[in-house]
C-alpha cells in the first residue's frame, strides 16, 4: 500500500505545503508544535479540506482540487487516533468499539469483530467499563480498537503518548510499536519527540513551518539531517557556525580550527552538527582536536552533561558522557575534545 500527498493549506502564520509519500513501513512526521503535522493528518482523513493539491491512497484519489474530487471521511479508509482519544464517555468499551462497526449491517458479524478486537487489544476484562474507569493506556487501546474495527487502509496516530504519564509511556509505546509493525497498510505517527520517531518508525518526514525539510530512512536523516532546523529536531545539541574550506573541510568559528568531514560539504554550508555523545577526549595533535575549557556540569541518572567553551569563551559545546553505574563520578574535564569525520554533519540554513 502507498500514500502520496502533495497539498497546500493556508494556516495562521504560514502556508502548509506537505509533499511526501509513505509505503507499508511506519513513517513518522517529526516537527515542533504548530508546524502543520496534525493538520496534515486531518487533510488526509478528510476532516479538513486543503486549498489545493492531491492525495492518493493505493492509486485511489482521495482529494484532487483540479478534478474537484473530495471524498468524505467515511469513504477514505482512514483511521485517525486523536491526542485525547475522543472516546464517548457515556458508552462502555464494548459500545465504543461497536461504534466503529456501524457500516457492518450483520449484527452477528459486528459482535464477532468486536469480540476479536477485545481479545487482540487485551480489553476483554474491561468490556463493560466506561472511559472514566480506564487508565490512559487502556483508553488508548480502546480508541485503537474502535479505529481498527473498520479495517482502515491507513492508520494515523496524532501524538499518541502526549496524554500519558511518563511511567506509562514506555509500556504503551511498546504496544503501539507492535501494532504499527504488524499493520497491513500505511501507518503515520505524528510526534515532536525524536526518540519516539526513531524507535517506532523506520521512515521519517521532517516538517518545519509547513515545509518538508527532509524525508527518507530515519537512520539516514539522523546521520545527515542537512539543515540546521532538522538537526535540532533530531536532538543535535551542538550546532557550530563554520566557513567552508573545501569539499570535505570547514573552519569552526570561535576556534579557528579546521575540521575534516566524511560527508561532502555543500557550497551553502554555514554550520556543522556534532552530537553530544560523539565527542571524545584526545591529545592536542589528534585529528579534529578542539581546545576546550570546562564551564559547567550536570548529572542525569545515566549520564553526565558537560558544557565546554572555546579558549576565547565565545563558543560553547555540549559533551555527554555515559555512566557505567548510577554512582559514577563526574568525568575529568579534558583540555581537548575531538569527533570522528563520520560524526560531523554539514548543515545549511
Region annotations inferred by a language model:
Residues 42-43, 203:
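The short alpha-helix immediately C-terminal to the Walker A/P-loop
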Residues 54-76:
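ABC ATPase NBD Q-loop/coupling interface
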Residues 47, 78, 82-88, 193:
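Catalytic "switch" loops of ABC-type ATPases
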Residues 38-41, 141-142:
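ABC ATPase nucleotide-binding domain helices that frame the ATP-binding cleft
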Residues 48-49, 56, 102, 181:
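A position-specific signal in ABC ATPase nucleotide-binding domains
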Residues 77, 92-229:
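ABC ATPase nucleotide-binding domains
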Residues 222-245, 273:
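C-terminal boundary and immediately downstream tail of ABC-type ATPase nucleotide-binding domains
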Residues 5-26, 32, 38-39, 46-49, ...:
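Non-catalytic connector elements of ABC transporters
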Amino acid at each position: 500500500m502507498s500514500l502520496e500527498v502533495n497539498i497546500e493549506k493556508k494556516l495562521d502564520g504560514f502556508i502548509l505545503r506537505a509533499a511526501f509519500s509513505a509505503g507499508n513501513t511506519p513513517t513518522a512526521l517529526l516537527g515542533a508544535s504548530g508546524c502543520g503535522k496534525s493538520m496534515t493528518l486531518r487533510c488526509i482523513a478528510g476532516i479538513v479540506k486543503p486549498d489545493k493539491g492531491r492525495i492518493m491512497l493505493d492509486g485511489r484519489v482521495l482529494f484532487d482540487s483540479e478534478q474537484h474530487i473530495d471524498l468524505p471521511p467515511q469513504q477514505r479508509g482512514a483511521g485517525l487516533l486523536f491526542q485525547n482519544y475522543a472516546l464517548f464517555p457515556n458508552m462502555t468499551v464494548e459500545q465504543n468499539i461497536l461504534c466503529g462497526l456501524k457500516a457492518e449491517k450483520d449484527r452477528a458479524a459486528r459482535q464477532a469483530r468486536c469480540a476479536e478486537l477485545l481479545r487482540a487489544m487485551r480489553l476483554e476484562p474491561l468490556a463493560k467499563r466506561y472511559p472514566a474507569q480506564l487508565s490512559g493506556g487502556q483508553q488508548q487501546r480502546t480508541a485503537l480498537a474502535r479505529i481498527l474495527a473498520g479495517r482502515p487502509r491507513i492508520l494515523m496516530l496524532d501524538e499518541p503518548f502526549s496524554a500519558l504519564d511518563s511511567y506509562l509511556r514506555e509500556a504503551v509505546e511498546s504496544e503501539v510499536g507492535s501494532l504499527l509493525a504488524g499493520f497491513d497498510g500505511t501507518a503515520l505517527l505524528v510526534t515532536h519527540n525524536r526518540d519516539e520517531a526513531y524507535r517506532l518508525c523506520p521512515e521519517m518526514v521532517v516538517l518545519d513551518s509547513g515545509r518538508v525539510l527532509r524525508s527518507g530512512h530515519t537512520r539516514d536523516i539522523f546521520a545527515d539531517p542537512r539543515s540546521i532546523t532538522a538537526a535540532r529536531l533530531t536532538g543535535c545539541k551542538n550546532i557550530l557556525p563554520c566557513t567552508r574550506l573545501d569539499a570535505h573541510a570547514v573552519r569552526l568559528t570561535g576556534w579557528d580550527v579546521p575540521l575534516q568531514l566524511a560527508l561532502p560539504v555543500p557550497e551553502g554550508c554555514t554550520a556543522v552538527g556534532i552530537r553530544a555523545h560523539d565527542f571524545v577526549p584526545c591529545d592536542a595533535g589528534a585529528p579534529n582536536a578542539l581546545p576546550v575549557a570546562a564551564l559547567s556540569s550536570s548529572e542525569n541518572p545515566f549520564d553526565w552533561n558537560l558544557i565546554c567553551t572555546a579558549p576565547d569563551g565565545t563558543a560553547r559545546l555540549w559533551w555527554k558522557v555515559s555512566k557505567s553505574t548510577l554512582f559514577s563520578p563526574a568525568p575529568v574535564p579534558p583540555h581537548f575534545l575531538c569527533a570522528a569525520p563520520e560524526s560531523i554533519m554539514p548543515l545549511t540554513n
